[in-house]
Amino acid sequence: MNKVILMGRLTRDPEVRYSQGENSTAIARYTLAVDRRFRRNNDGEQTADFIGCVAFGRSAEFAEKYFRQGLKVIVTGRIQTGSYTNKEGQKVYTTDVVVEDQEFAES
C-alpha cells in the first residue's frame, strides 16, 4: 500500500502548466511546509519538511483557482519517485506526492 496524508501550508502559489496534445491536461505543482511533531532543539524552534506535490486534471485546476501561498491544506495521495539527468549530466532523483484528494484545512 502506498498512501500519504499531509497537512501543511503552501510555500508559494502553485505552478500550473498544460500537457501537449489533443486532450491537454492541467498539471499543478506546489510545495507544502509540513511541521514536524517534535521541536528541533531546546530553544523551541519548529522544524518543517518541504514536500513536493503534483496534481492532475480537475485537481490541478482547483489548485490553480483556489490555492495561494500560506494557505493551510490537507492532501491525500501516494508517493512517487523518479529521476532525470540535469544539464550538467548528473542524475537527479525526485520524490513527489501525487495528489488524489486535496482540501482546505481552515476556513
What are these regions (language model features)?
Residues 1-107:
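Single-stranded nucleic acid-binding surfaces, predominantly the OB-fold ssDNA-binding core
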